[in-house]
């Protein structure tokens, strides 16, 4: 079967830059899904995305669906004809449904008898007849939170649609998509190249669009060009461009034909903390800052223009002119804020509610101060510094800089604290209290900062759960899931000896009578432990491993992690499957036990297999206790793995529930002791 390349381009007005890539990849995925559902063979689907277009190109698309042979079985021959050999109504109805007569039906012999059967070949439809519907469905399935109408049309899309180009090889696929008739026309750049022109063949895309329309339709090509040119220009200035992936993709989504340029700002602005300058350059202007080899901000920046004049000086001057007022504002806010110490802003925190039932930000800082001190004492941090950082933790929220540039909270607190002469550990903690801000983010460096970060997050978790506002479904307005995972990461990765029950109980006490949920401690701890699952799954750890540890509910996160790592290792051992099954069997036997179970008595043992297992269990009980005390759970399970043979021999040769009570009690005691050895690490019976 011959194949052709197929092009579908949807020409629109400017698409939302932060959504462009997601829309384009979803479009390609949907097209691929629809092609598969239609049974159309193809090699691969390529996607293209620029500010005013979404496109897919299907390579090697078959020109028709494959023919299908269908077999439709009818009634049994015995039921298809009456005593006189005439077709019954059942047979005639079935034949009519197949579009044949009963006489035209074939017969199928099986070991259960003979049946009427109709076999036919259904010819596949030409691909041309299916493509409009495929593109229509693919567009309808795009993740568009808010659609719009335009002109007098009833159709809705993310932005108004002006052109639809559908080409299968050299053939135009006629039809209507989103109220627009398909054609060969594509539109070029708004200011460069040809405004619009026609394509003769799908294979001309995207090269002809670049040559005649001055549009680089390939998103990844534009992205690579911007990245490489930006790095070259930064190097030429003796620096390194700060190019974050998210901003790079947003800038890529804003331009059709990227022109990377550099500009500068006055050196006097470098007296302002770099974070504030960078915030406005990246967030407001979509510029890439440049740093020197020592990490200091240079008075230059990179921007990407969508036009490419012979003399770019006017564009450069324009961007310098635009950014200057924003940097001047930052300079003014910084100088104004320095006139008042952070500590002097504490009274203003009393005017800002943290949460109506939980009090003001001043109330929160008092709780953070106290809880940070408690945590510091347990992890070996300086209590005085931790409490001081907790007290000042939210003061920068009352500054002009943070009010205007909200993402600078924390980091501006650090700069202002340094200016005020605060201890360096205190100053750094004001910035690091918000870490980790997102998945994969760095953790607080110092133990003082860890104390404040944990205190802040646990105070929020305890307070919100304490008034009955735990996250429901996907809604999480206080970002409690992120806070819980952040706490776990800090405690585990820093190996801190903290118990969640203890910390949450202390946090609860600091709220006084504000909390209404009597089960707040258990609910917060269970919620936090539940976040382990998402974390470990992302690391590729099996769900049953996590569940085996959760079944024991260890409330020290570092200890929890050690158990998970140990069980994950145990699961790779040859004896793991058999021991997991044995633990299930032991669990079932003990659950049905109707007599008291005491200690093992070797003198009661009768069979050699039960004595061997009893001796092994007693010996291991003594061996593993020091290892459990050290938290070396991997070594514990390695030792217990040696029990496979005596356990197998026990179950092969010993009856547990015998009539003689003393013997039965002793055998149950052997199994109970065995089970408890494993349960000191995890519930191995949960493993699949």
Swiss-Prot record:
Main location: cytoplasm
Localisation per UniProt entry: Cytoplasm
GO MF entry, a single one: glycine-tRNA ligase activity
The organism's place on the tree of life at top rank: Bacteria
Annotated catalysed reactions: tRNA(Gly) + glycine + ATP = glycyl-tRNA(Gly) + AMP + diphosphate
GO biological process annotation, one example: glycyl-tRNA aminoacylation
InterPro entries, per database record: DALR_anticod-bd, Gly-tRNA-synth_bsu, Gly-tRNA-synth_heterodimer
Enzyme Commission code: 6.1.1.14
SUPFAM superfamilies the UniProt entry points to: HD-domain/PDEase-like (SSF109604)
Keyword set, alphabetical order: Aminoacyl-tRNA synthetase, ATP-binding, Cytoplasm, Ligase, Nucleotide-binding, Protein biosynthesis
GO cellular component: cytosol
Family, as annotated: Belongs to the class-II aminoacyl-tRNA synthetase family.
Subunit structure: Tetramer of two alpha and two beta subunits.
NCBIfam families: glyS (TIGR00211)
Cited PANTHER family: GLYCINE--TRNA LIGASE, CHLOROPLASTIC_MITOCHONDRIAL 2 (PTHR30075:SF2), GLYCYL-TRNA SYNTHETASE (PTHR30075)
Protein name: Glycine--tRNA ligase beta subunit
Origin species: Histophilus somni (strain 2336) (Haemophilus somnus)
UniProt lineage: Bacteria, Pseudomonadati, Pseudomonadota, Gammaproteobacteria, Pasteurellales
